[in-house]
């Protein structure tokens, strides 16, 4: 379930949409995302264009990218090149050789960059920094109210 903090923040910024489109639901289902997850609820209801900007970084509006870009191809390439397990989906364009990844099985979010962090992650030595998507989004938008 999406946290009340995220919902209130989204509403206050004019990003919250009560209606869910079938197209966005289908986009998430094509990625194997549970529509009742906090991840799905965020992307089904919150939108500020194709990306969200905060902390000098941007993350995708995943549904928009699945529908309007080559996200599925990029996803395949990411898994093949970086050797990241298939349950991890990128939340951004891997800017500056680093990026955020959502684990669709556990709900955890991970930030890794090319080099030692990627190697440690692949060896099981680096664990996701956020235990769930809510805590990641609350951190990403840097709010506490």
What is each residue range found by the language model?
Residues 115-143:
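Compact, glycine/acidic-enriched structural inserts
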Residues 105-119:
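Intrinsically disordered, low-complexity regulatory segments enriched in Ser/Thr/Pro
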Residues 66-69, 103, 125-126, 132:
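Helix N-cap / beta->alpha transition motif
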Residues 108, 142-145:
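N-terminal processing/targeting junctions
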Residues 1-100, 143-144:
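A surface-exposed partner-binding patch
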